[in-house]
Each structure stands twice: as structure tokens, then as C-alpha cells.
A protein has these predicted regions:
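Hydrolases whose catalytic domains are alpha/beta-hydrolase-1, hotdog thioesterase
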Residues: 5-9
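Gly/Ala-rich beta-loop-alpha elbow adjacent to hydrolase catalytic centers
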Residues: 1-2
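Helical cap/lid subdomain of alpha/beta-hydrolase-fold lipid enzymes
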Residues: 11-197
């Protein structure tokens, strides 16, 4: 989310007058399916799913959870209907709808392509949640969720979401949490930070 907040500064708050070039590392520019899954299904962080449902309900109160929802259809229901969770609200309780609206507003303010020269550094080739299949009840509420993992991301963010259209790209075969310690990435950062202006 830090990359998206940085883009917001550059694109909407006048940061383009102060920033010449921006390096984006592992940013979920088109959203993160993994974050969505934690909102739909109780995360299994502790053994035996202890406190999983409580954690899911807490995550639903975080504005940032809605800001990183995928901006394209990643879900399919039992009838084959595609679901864009950023645009659709049936999956949420009424008390969460204002947060969804804030997430939509934030995403609408971001430009779809690079406003200044950007470099997108991202991981690829690691199993990453890429889509969800849900079963809904008659009211449209989610009853069950299954998800698909494919080798098309960094374990957290899909490749297609991690680079901004119009930016230079620097892919590395690495997990999301390891991008900052990868030797290839450190060398690219050194090149970027020491280049003449």
C-alpha cells in the first residue's frame, strides 16, 4: 500500500513538482487478491484457526483493506457470474459500505499509468492467490470461498498488479517480503540512487 500512497502524493498532492523519479517495490497497483481473501475468509494465522473470525472482522474495519481491493473481476460465483469486489457491495455488511466507498474514491484518484518516470520492481514466479470462487446465498452473501494459487506473483501481489503501466520494469524471482534484501534489487537501487541528475 505504501507505493499507492506515494503515487497519491505524486499524482494528486503536487509531489510531481518535487520528485523526479520514483521506485515502486512490490506495489499492488491493481489490488491484492490475498488481501481480499482475508476479508472473505477467516485467516489461519494461529493454530486451529484460533481468533481467525475475530481477525477477519477487525480487517473489515481497516480503510486500507478496501484501498487494495483488486480493481478488476477476480471472483466467480456458483453461476459463473464474474465479481469485481471493489465495485460490488453485496458481499459486505451495511456498516462496512462507507469504507468501501472511501476505497473506491482513493483508487479513482490514482492515474492508470505513470505520471513521472517510475521503476516498478516486483517478484514473479511464486505461487500467489490469483482468483476466488464463491458460493452465495439468495441474499448475495458469501457462504463459502475457494481460491486458486498460480506461479504468477510474489506470494502476495500478482505480477499483473505489481507494475504500473508506462513504468520501467525490473522483475526478480523473489517473494514479496524478500524484495528489499534481494541482491539484484539492491544493485538496481544503487544504480538508481547514484545516477547523475
Amino acid at each position: 500500500l505504501g507505493t499507492m500512497v506515494t503515487r497519491y502524493y505524486v499524482e494528486s498532492l503536487g509531489g510531481d513538482k518535487h520528485v523526479e523519479r520514483l521506485i515502486l517495490m512490490g506495489g499492488p497497483h491493481k489490488g491484492a487478491v490475498k488481501g481480499l481473501v482475508s476479508m472473505l475468509v477467516a485467516p489461519e494465522i494461529l493454530p486451529f484457526g484460533i481468533m481467525g473470525e475475530r481477525l477477519r472482522k477487525i480487517l473489515l474495519t481497516f480503510p486500507s483493506s478496501y484501498q487494495i481491493l483488486p480493481d478488476y473481476s477476480v471472483g466467480t460465483d456458483q453461476y459463473g457470474v464474474k465479481i469485481n469486489f471493489l465495485e460490488e457491495s453485496d458481499w459486505l455488511n451495511p456498516e462496512n459500505l462507507p469504507l468501501l466507498k472511501l476505497g473506491q474514491d482513493f483508487r479513482n484518484e490514482l492515474k492508470p499509468s505513470a505520471a513521472i518516470p517510475y521503476v516498478s520492481i516486483f517478484g514473479y514466479g511464486i505461487k500467489t492467490i490469483s482468483s476466488v470462487s464463491i458460493r452465495r446465498d439468495a441474499a448475495g452473501k458469501t457462504e463459502s470461498v475457494d481460491y486458486l494459487r498460480e506461479n504468477i506473483g510474489d506470494g502476495s501481489v500478482l505480477e499483473q498488479s505489481a507494475f504500473l503501466h508506462g513504468s520501467e520494469i525490473h522483475p526478480v524471482h523473489q517473494h514479496h517480503g524478500s524484495l528489499f534484501v534481494d541482491n539484484d534489487v539492491k544493485m538496481r537501487l544503487k544504480v538508481e540512487l547514484t545516477r547523475p541528475y
